[in-house]
């Protein structure tokens, strides 16, 4: 989901609450857990955002979810606030914004690394070291295997795409031959 001024504001407030206690990563883990719960049961998400359901019923549902997932008091309060202000629709964007803001605080850069086959630990370490050198931050790799790439690696980091795949090389070569 796309970031909005609303989601960014809530994410920033949550980072400001979590940072002093060193809870940035654990708060993100809980947000991700809640996001997965909503993804597994989309009807629940729609039910919570429904204007026709009584507020006390929604509060009860949120309490049950919070207890089941063992959410922190801060996240329980956030959920209640989002529900009360009818802003649950911004939750996915809030999670993405939170991760981005928390990464800045923690000095991290996230990179999505796609390859045709799984990368061994040495290659992962080399990629991580190069990204750390280039961006001056510790790199967190999110690995994905995409067999259609044929070979090589495509890295998406900080709004840039570094494409060293065989597929893109063949595409460039075809472009040269056709022109």
From Swiss-Prot:
A GO MF term: proton-transporting ATP synthase activity, rotational mechanism
Assembly information from the UniProt record: F-type ATPases have 2 components, F(1) - the catalytic core - and F(0) - the membrane proton channel. F(1) has five subunits: alpha(3), beta(3), gamma(1), delta(1), epsilon(1). F(0) has three main subunits: a(1), b(2) and c(10-14). The alpha and beta chains form an alternating ring which encloses part of the gamma chain. F(1) is attached to F(0) by a central stalk formed by the gamma and epsilon chains, while a peripheral stalk is formed by the delta and b chains.
Protein name per its UniProtKB record: ATP synthase subunit delta 1
Membrane topology (UniProt): Peripheral membrane protein
Cell location: Cell inner membrane
One cellular component term from this protein's GO annotations in UniProt: proton-transporting ATP synthase complex
Family per record: Belongs to the ATPase delta chain family.
The organism of origin for this protein: Syntrophotalea carbinolica (strain DSM 2380 / NBRC 103641 / GraBd1)
Xref: HAMAP family: ATP_synth_delta_bact (MF_01416)
Pfam families found in the cross-reference section: OSCP
InterPro entries attached to this UniProt entry: ATP_synth_OSCP/delta_N_sf, ATPase_OSCP/dsu
Keyword annotations from UniProtKB, A to Z: ATP synthesis, Cell inner membrane, Cell membrane, CF(1), Hydrogen ion transport, Ion transport, Membrane, Transport
Keyword Cell inner membrane: yes
Role noted for this protein: F(1)F(0) ATP synthase produces ATP from ADP in the presence of a proton or sodium gradient. F-type ATPases consist of two structural domains, F(1) containing the extramembraneous catalytic core and F(0) containing the membrane proton channel, linked together by a central stalk and a peripheral stalk. During catalysis, ATP synthesis in the catalytic domain of F(1) is coupled via a rotary mechanism of the central stalk subunits to proton translocation.
């Amino acid at each position: 989901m796309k970031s909005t001024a609303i989601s960014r504001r809530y994410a920033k407030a949550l980072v400001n609450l979590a940072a002093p206690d060193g809870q940035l990563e654990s708060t993100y883990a809980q947000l991700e857990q809640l996001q997965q719960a909503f993804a597994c049961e989309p009807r629940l998400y729609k039910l919570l955002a429904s204007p026709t359901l009584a507020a006390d019923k929604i509060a009860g549902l949120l309490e049950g979810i919070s207890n089941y997932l063992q959410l922190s008091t801060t996240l329980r309060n956030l959920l209640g606030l989002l529900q009360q202000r009818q802003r649950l629709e911004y939750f996915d964007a809030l999670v993405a914004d939170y991760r981005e803001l928390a990464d800045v605080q923690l000095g991290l850069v996230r990179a999505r690394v796609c390859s045709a086959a799984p990368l061994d630990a040495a290659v992962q370490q080399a990629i991580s070291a190069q990204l750390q050198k280039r961006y001056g931050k510790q790199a967190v790799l999110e690995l994905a295997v995409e067999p259609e790439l044929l070979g090589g690696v495509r890295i998406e980091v900080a709004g840039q795409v570094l494409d060293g795949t065989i597929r893109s090389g063949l595409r460039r070569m075809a472009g040269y031959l056709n022109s």
